[in-house]
Amino acid sequence: DIAMAQSATTSDGSAAPSSTVAGTATAVTANAPALSSEETATQRSELDAKDAVVSDDVPVVRAWDNEVMSVYQKLAEKTHALGPVMGEQVDLVGKALDEVRTLIVAASHCRKPEQGLNTAVVAEYLQPLQTALKSVIEFREAHRGEKTFFNHLSTLSEGISSLGWVAVEPTPGPYISEMKDSAQFYANRVIKDFKGVSESHVDWVRSFMALLDTMKSYVMTH
C-alpha cells in the first residue's frame, strides 16, 4: 500500500473531490494528534526521502515510469500539438505526476508510520503535490476565455483530481474512477464538438482517459 495519507471526506462520508484533497495538508494539520518530539523525529526520519539520496531503482517506481509516465508522454505530445495553451497545462499535469513519483519513492523506502498518516509531518510531505494539483486547476480558471479549449482545460482540471489517490485509503482505486467520471463530463463535450470535424481532439480525449485508466491499474496492482 503506497497511499501516503487519508483523504478528506464530504458530509455524507464519501471521498472528497480533488479541490478538497488539494487542501488536505491544512485539514490534516488541524486534526493531527499531538506527538512528542521523539515521535515526530521518528516519523520524519521514516518519510524523509526528499532530502536524502535514495534509490528510485525499485519495482514500484520502475512500474510508475514504465506504465504511467510512458502513457503521459504520449498524451503530452498530442496535447502540445493542439496549441501552446494546452501544452502549458499538460506540462503542469506532468509536474503533478512527478510529485506523485516523489511520494512513491519515499513510500518505497519506509514503512507506514506507527503514529498513522493523519499527522502534520505527513501533511508537510503532501504539500508539493497539493500545490501542483492547485496549479492545474487554477490554470483552467485563468483561461476561461478560451472558447476553443475550455472543455479541454476543464477535462484536465477535473481529471487531475485523480492524483489525490495518494491521500486515500484503504481503497484508492475507486477514487480514481470517481474523478475520471468528473473529467468525462467535459471530455464528452470535446468529443461532441470535434467528432467528424477534427479527430485529433477526439484522440486526445482517449489518450487522457487512457492515462487515468493506466494509473488506476497501477494503483490496484501496487
Q: Model-found features: residue ranges?
A:
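Extended, domain-scale alpha-helical bundle/helix-rich regions
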Residues: W165-H222
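Mid-membrane cores of alpha-helical transmembrane segments in multi-pass membrane proteins
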Residues: T155-S157, S182
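Generic recognition of well-structured, leucine-rich alpha-helical segments
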Residues: I2-A5, A107, V136, P170, ...
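Generic N-terminal leader/targeting and pre-domain segments
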Residues: D1-T131
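Short amphipathic alpha-helical coiled-coil/interface segments
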Residues: L97-V100, L126-L133, I160, K180, ...
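Generic surface-pattern signal
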Residues: Q73, E77-H80, D98, V105, ...
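Short, charged/polar, low-complexity loop and linker segments
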Residues: K134-F139, S157-V168
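Non-transmembrane, amphipathic alpha-helical segments
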Residues: A49-V60, A81-L92, L117, V121-E124, ...
